[in-house]
């Protein structure tokens, strides 16, 4: 039926199995979005990343996991392995189609749908308790925001969302501070002052 297929995979072997199976198929959907998207992508092998980039398989990852659930990662994987998890910089450099999500409501955090701890985790590569999560995989704030907005819309084929530009639906947030200018350590403190859908204010904090 030409629909995008979404599969969830955490762990090197699980990701490899999903990517290997998807790579055996030709693109079946009509739009520019990936025919298969794989959620989470904890610690993919280089071969899985290469195949995904070549076949146009999309990856959706959530740095909030290492930020919010650091104890579990350290207890089960150890810090050195954990530093290789959610390798955002490597994925971007590979050319694979990539975006962010919060994975709400599953995320173990005070406000699972809050995107700002996720962005902070991607930028600082530090957990809530300060644990180093692999700074070589960090991205800048603008890149993290784009992965959360434009790239997320593109991933699922929403062609008039994700950007503020002529002809788009004017869905946007007004924040209480400039996320591009504040110190990265303050990103999780950002508040939404207003939310606009289709150019109409549907939420105001004041």
Regions found by a protein language model. Name each.
Residues 2-6, 13-36, 41, 46-50, ...:
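His/Asp/Glu-enriched, well-ordered alpha-helical/loop segment
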Residues 184:
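Short, solvent-exposed loop/beta-turn-alpha elements that line the ligand-binding surface or hinge
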Residues 56:
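Hard-cation-handling environments
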Residues 187:
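Unchanged
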């Amino acid at each position: 039926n030409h629909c995008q297929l979404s599969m969830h995979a955490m762990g090197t072997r699980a990701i490899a199995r999903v990517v290997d199976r998807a790579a055996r198929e030709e693109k079946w959907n009509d739009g520019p979005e990936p025919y298969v998207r794989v959620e989470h992508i904890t610690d993919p092998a280089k071969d899985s990343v290469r195949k995904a980039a070549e076949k146009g398989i999309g990856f959706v990852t959530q740095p909030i996991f290492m930020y919010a659930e650091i104890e579990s990662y350290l207890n089960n994987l150890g810090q050195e392995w954990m530093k290789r998890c959610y390798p955002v910089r490597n994925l971007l450099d590979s050319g694979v189609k990539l975006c962010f999500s919060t994975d709400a409501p599953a995320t173990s955090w005070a406000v699972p749908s809050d995107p700002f701890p996720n962005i902070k985790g991607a930028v600082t590569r530090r957990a809530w308790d300060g644990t180093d999560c692999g700074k070589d995989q960090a991205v800048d704030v603008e890149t993290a925001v784009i992965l959360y907005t434009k790239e997320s819309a593109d991933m699922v084929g929403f062609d008039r969302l994700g950007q503020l530009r002529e002809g788009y639906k004017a869905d946007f947030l007004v924040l209480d501070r400039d996320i591009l200018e504040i110190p990265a350590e303050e990103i999780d403190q950002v508040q939404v002052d207003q939310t606009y859908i289709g150019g109409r204010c549907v939420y105001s904090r004041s």
